[in-house]
C-alpha cells in the first residue's frame, strides 16, 4: 500500500460514524412522558410539544422530526402550545424550562378569559 492510501485510511477510520438519534416518542395527557426510541437516519431533532387546554390540563407529545419549527403560541387556535427541539440523544426527556412556562402565563390567562 502506498503511504498516501495508508494515511487516507487512517484518517477515515478516525472519523465518527453517523448514528441515528435516540429520542423519547410518546403522547401523554399529563405532565411528562418517557419512551426512548431510535429515530430513522434522516431525523435531526427530538421535539417536545405541550398543548395547554386549561392551566391544569395539558397534552405532551414527543417525537423524532427531520426539521424543527419552535413555537410559543400559534395564534390561531384557542389552546396555548409550546414546541421545543434539541439534537442529542434523549434530550427531550426533561420538561420545558420554567421560563418558557412562565412566558405562557399571559396566554393561558387570555385563553381562560376567552372561555368565560
Swiss-Prot record:
CDD domains: TFP_LU_ECD_LYNX1
Lipid-carrying residues in chain (GPI-anchor amidated asparagine): 92
Signal sequence region: 1-20
Location within or outside the cell: Cell membrane; Cell projection, Dendrite; Endoplasmic reticulum
Transmembrane segments: none
SMART domains reported for this sequence: LU
Keyword terms: Cell membrane, Cell projection, Disulfide bond, Endoplasmic reticulum, Glycoprotein, GPI-anchor, Lipoprotein, Membrane, Signal
Membrane topology of this protein: Lipid-anchor; GPI-anchor
Paired cysteines (S-S): 23-46, 26-33, 39-64, 68-85, 86-91
One GO CC term, this protein: plasma membrane
GO molecular function: acetylcholine receptor binding; acetylcholine receptor inhibitor activity; acetylcholine receptor regulator activity; ion channel inhibitor activity
Listed InterPro entries: Ly-6/neurotoxin-like_GPI-ap (IPR051110), LY6_UPA_recep-like (IPR016054), Snake_toxin-like_sf (IPR045860), Toxin/TOLIP (IPR035076)
Positions of the propeptide removed during maturation: 93-116
Record domain UPAR/Ly6: where: 21-105
Pfam short name (any one): Toxin_TOLIP
Protein's GO biological process: acetylcholine receptor signaling pathway; regulation of neurotransmitter receptor activity; synaptic transmission, cholinergic
Purpose: Acts in different tissues through interaction to nicotinic acetylcholine receptors (nAChRs). The proposed role as modulator of nAChR activity seems to be dependent on the nAChR subtype and stoichiometry, and to involve an effect on nAChR trafficking and its cell surface expression, and on single channel properties of the nAChR inserted in the plasma membrane. Modulates functional properties of nicotinic acetylcholine receptors (nAChRs) to prevent excessive excitation, and hence neurodegeneration.
Record text on subunit structure and interactions: Interacts with nAChRs containing alpha-4:beta-2 (CHRNA4:CHRNB2) and alpha-7 (CHRNA7) subunits. Interacts with CHRNA4 probably in the endoplasmic reticulum prior to nAChR pentameric assembly. Interacts with KCNA2/Potassium voltage-gated channel subfamily A member 2.
Name recorded for this polypeptide: Ly-6/neurotoxin-like protein 1
Species for this entry: Pan troglodytes (Chimpanzee)
Amino acid at each position: 500500500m502506498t503511504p498516501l492510501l495508508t494515511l487516507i485510511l487512517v484518517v477515515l477510520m478516525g472519523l465518527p460514524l453517523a448514528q441515528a438519534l435516540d429520542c423519547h416518542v410518546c403522547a401523554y395527557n399529563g405532565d411528562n412522558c418517557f419512551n426512548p426510541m431510535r429515530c430513522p437516519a434522516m431525523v435531526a431533532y427530538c421535539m417536545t410539544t405541550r398543548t395547554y387546554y386549561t392551566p391544569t390540563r395539558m397534552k405532551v407529545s414527543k417525537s423524532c422530526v427531520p426539521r424543527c419549527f419552535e413555537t410559543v403560541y400559534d395564534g390561531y387556535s384557542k389552546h396555548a402550545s409550546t414546541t421545543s427541539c434539541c439534537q442529542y440523544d434523549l434530550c427531550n426527556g426533561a420538561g420545558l424550562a420554567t421560563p418558557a412556562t412562565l412566558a405562557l402565563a399571559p396566554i393561558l390567562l387570555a385563553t381562560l378569559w376567552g372561555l368565560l
